């Protein structure tokens, strides 16, 4: 039979049809009539079988039964009954088989050339397909074959002759079936060995594949880590590059600013040089105009005596002496001419002196200007050095920021600050207050009474204006006035013979102080004083001065409202669990937050509204009336004033007495000793006669009764106790101590509130040194007792003094 496929294929219709065809062929070869068809027989076997092996074994037995019928050519019993009554003792037919063994003798049936070979081949194919399933099926097959011998019986009674006939018919083929079974077992064992080897190879292959897969996964993880590291390095490089680019851009901007500052300084130096040249030219022009005026005066004087032709004296610049010689020698008149020449000489001398003084002043001014320029250059160099230092610090800060950013980027998942969002710290501006007072122009500009017009920051050339200059004798317009200089850079007024007038074409220019500052200021300012610089306190209004009064009012109001803090807290605790007043609770909490939290600041108007709301809630909160404001005491505060204040504040507290006792009782006990209490007073009432006769207090009687037997106490008969005081005589009767004089005690009427008194009689203890020692010890030990002590304590002290004297002796 051809049995392809796994264990579940034996239930398929195709497989069952093949089995029906084989049964039909066996029935046809048997040649005898049967009551049932091959399909019915196969369906009966199919319903009885539970596994493939059981199904095949039952079909094989059925086919063997038909073959035996064919051999005997006799009518046998019903094949179904024969199938049910086959004995199980025949080896190799129904009995238990070893694992992997198949039905023997199936290859010998005349069912076709490839009938039973197909069964074996199908089983081999099935074994090759599932070796693990074959092992399980073989184990199940043994159990099922044992059960088949007992369970598969359709009819329990059959003739013994038929059974014997079938046994005899089956015996010839039993030996051959055993041989065939052994061959099949060996073949099946070989197949199992091959399958085991294949399984081992497959397991090894799977292990190798798993190892390869693991190595691939590790390689992929390493590649991902390398990619992440490369990305982080690229990002860090980009951050570094951006930071370096920013630093370079800032350095370039600073270099450009320095170059501009140097260019401005050079331009200012050129302007100053031009101004000096202009000043010299103006001085020369003034000298020429003065000479021309002198010549005109001389010509006028000469014209009065003798008419002469006037030459162009202003065109030639010659000394006054040579001009006098050229004009006065050929045209001299007696009397008037000599006087006029003398006057002209005096005027010339004065003019020469004035010119010399003017030249000296100009030289001094030039020297001062040069010194100022040198100072300005030094200041510029210092500022450049400071800027370089600031640049270096700024670059260091940027490098630190870049390092921090790189550290942040090294951790995945964190937010990385964008380099473009970083605002570089502004360089501290050079305070122009240090440079403006050094500029003489600014000081001069503020002190000039004539310059009332608005002008730009004046240049150092304006220092010439406030100086005094002797006016010419006759202020007349000169024939050659100083023309307007278009190339003049001076912004201040230039001196002219006609008075101090500004130049016709003043051009505003920046002063050195303004060029040094990195911030450009508005041009039209009256003086450098009100410039809005950080260092000028007059230009920037202090916010502290403006809000000082408001802060003071706010703090005073907050101090006034501090009395509502505790009542407000009690009110909040009271309505905290009341759900109906949640809104009021939130408002009260906000009010309490405003009053208690110093960081919470609200406007003064809001605080006033809070005061109104608290006044409305005053009755509900039961705010205590504030005490009158304390009078400022200039005297020294009393030492115990804090304790008195605390007592006054807590005097009405129900636990105040307990707190005082708990606080001060240990100290009072250490100072005054333990409280002396007498025995409890009996409940029964004494008779009046007993009270009148009783002269000694009960406390004292009880204490004397409890004394040690070594103390003998008696009343002193020499004293009467009319005033309530009790006098006692105490003796020491101790076998271990020597005899000493008795002790006389006086107990006050209010004992134990007052301590007993020892009536010291020094004469009794002056008899010998031993008694003097006892007296000394007694006196010193009494000082160590508390101010309130009992009779027992006093007597014990006396005994200790005697014992101490004995030890010292």
Curated annotation (Swiss-Prot):
Where is there biased composition of kind Gly residues?
119-128
- List the Gene3D superfamilies: Coactivator CBP, KIX domain
Location of the protein in the cell:
Cytoplasm; Nucleus
Start-end of Polar residues biased regions? 533-549
Q: What is any one of the record's Gene Ontology cellular component terms?
A: core mediator complex
- The segment annotated Disordered runs over 115-137, 183-211, 413-549
Any one Gene Ontology MF annotation carried by this entry is: transcription coregulator activity
Pfam family, any one: Med15_C
Superkingdom: Eukaryota
Tell me if Zinc-finger is a UniProt keyword of this record: no
Q: How does it assemble?
A: Component of the Mediator complex. Interacts with srebf1 and srebf2. Interacts with smad2, smad3 and smad4.
The family annotation for this protein states: Belongs to the Mediator complex subunit 15 family.
Name of this chain's protein: Mediator of RNA polymerase II transcription subunit 15
Q: Which organism is it from?
A: Danio rerio (Zebrafish)
Encoding gene per record? med15
């Amino acid at each position: 039979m051809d049995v392809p496929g796994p264990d579940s294929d034996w239930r398929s219709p195709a497989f069952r049809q093949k089995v029906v065809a084989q049964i039909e062929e066996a029935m046809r070869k048997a040649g005898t009539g049967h009551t049932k068809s091959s399909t019915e027989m196969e369906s009966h076997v199919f319903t009885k079988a539970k596994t493939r092996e059981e199904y095949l074994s039952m079909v094989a037995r059925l086919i063997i039964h038909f073959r035996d019928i064919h051999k005997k050519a006799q009518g046998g019993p019903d094949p179904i009954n024969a199938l049910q009554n086959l004995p199980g003792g025949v080896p190799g037919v129904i009995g238990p088989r070893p694992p992997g063994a198949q039905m023997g003798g199936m290859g010998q049936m005349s069912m076709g050339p490839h009938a039973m070979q197909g069964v074996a081949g199908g089983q081999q194919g099935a074994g090759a397909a599932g070796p693990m399933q074959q092992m399980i099926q073989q184990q199940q097959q043994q159990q099922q074959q044992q059960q088949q011998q007992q369970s598969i019986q359709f009819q329990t009674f059959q003739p013994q002759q038929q059974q014997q006939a079938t046994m005899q018919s089956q015996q010839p083929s039993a030996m051959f079936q055993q041989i065939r079974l052994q061959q099949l077992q060996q073949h099946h064992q070989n197949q199992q060995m091959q399958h085991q080897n294949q399984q081992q190879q497959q397991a090894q292959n799977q292990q190798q594949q798993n190892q390869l897969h693991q190595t691939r996964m590790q390689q992929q993880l390493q590649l991902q880590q390398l990619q992440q590291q490369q990305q982080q390095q690229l990002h860090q490089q980009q951050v570094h590059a951006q930071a370096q680019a920013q630093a370079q851009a800032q350095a370039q901007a600073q270099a450009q600013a320095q170059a501009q500052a140097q260019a401005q300084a050079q331009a200012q130096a050129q302007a100053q040089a031009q101004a000096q040249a202009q000043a010299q030219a103006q001085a020369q022009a003034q000298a020429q105009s003065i000479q021309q005026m002198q010549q005109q005066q001389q010509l006028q004087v000469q014209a009065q005596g003798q008419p002469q032709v006037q030459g162009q004296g202003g065109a030639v610049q010659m000394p006054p002496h040579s001009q006098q010689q050229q004009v006065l020698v050929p045209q001299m008149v007696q009397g008037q001419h000599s006087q006029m020449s003398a006057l002209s000489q005096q005027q010339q001398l004065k003019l020469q002196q004035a010119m010399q003084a003017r030249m000296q002043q100009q030289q001094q001014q030039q020297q001062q200007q040069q010194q100022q320029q040198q100072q300005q250059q030094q200041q510029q160099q210092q500022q450049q050095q400071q800027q370089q230092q600031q640049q270096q610090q700024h670059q260091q800060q940027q490098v630190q920021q870049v390092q921090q950013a790189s550290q942040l980027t090294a951790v995945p998942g964190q937010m990385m600050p964008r380099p473009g969002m970083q605002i570089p710290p502004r360089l501290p501006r050079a305070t122009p207050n240090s440079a403006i007072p050094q500029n003489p122009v600014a000081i001069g500009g503020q002190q000039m009474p004539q310059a009332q017009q608005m002008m730009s920051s004046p240049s150092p050339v304006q220092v010439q204006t406030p100086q005094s200059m002797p006016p010419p004798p006759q202020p007349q317009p000169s024939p050659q006035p100083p023309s307007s200089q278009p190339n003049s850079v001076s912004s201040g007024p230039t001196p002219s013979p006609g008075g101090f007038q500004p130049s016709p074409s003043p051009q505003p220019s920046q002063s050195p102080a303004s060029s040094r500052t990195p911030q450009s200021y508005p041009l039209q300012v009256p003086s450098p004083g009100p410039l809005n610089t950080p260092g000028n306190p007059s230009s920037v209004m202090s916010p502290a001065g403006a809000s000082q009064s408001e802060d003071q009012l706010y703090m005073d109001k907050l101090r006034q409202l501090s009395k509502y803090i505790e009542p407000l807290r009690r009110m909040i605790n009271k309505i905290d669990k009341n759900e109906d007043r949640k809104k009021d609770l939130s408002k009260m909490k906000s009010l309490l937050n405003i009053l208690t939290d110093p960081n919470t600041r609200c406007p003064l108007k809001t605080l006033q509204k809070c005061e109104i709301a608290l006044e409305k809630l005053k009755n509900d909160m039961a705010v205590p009336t504030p005490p009158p404001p304390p009078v400022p005491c200039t005297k020294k505060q009393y030492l115990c004033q804090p304790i008195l204040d605390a007592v006054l504040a807590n005097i009405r507290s129900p636990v105040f007495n307990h707190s005082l006792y708990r606080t001060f009782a240990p100290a009072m006990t250490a100072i005054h000793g333990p409280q002396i209490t007498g025995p409890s007073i009996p409940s029964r009432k004494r008779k009046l006669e007993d009270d009148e006769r009783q002269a000694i207090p009960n406390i004292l009687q009880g204490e004397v009764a409890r004394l040690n037997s070594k103390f003998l106490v008696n009343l002193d008969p020499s004293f009467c106790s009319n005033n309530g005081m009790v006098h006692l005589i105490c003796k020491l009767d101790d076998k271990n101590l020597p005899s000493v004089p008795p002790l006389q005690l006086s107990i006050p009427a209010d004992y134990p509130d007052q301590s007993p008194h020892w009536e010291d009689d020094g004469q009794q203890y002056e008899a010998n040194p031993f008694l003097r020692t006892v007296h000394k010890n007694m006196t010193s030990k009494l000082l160590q007792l508390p101010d309130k002590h009992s009779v027992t304590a006093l007597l014990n002290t006396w005994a200790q003094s005697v014992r101490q004297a004995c030890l010292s002796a």
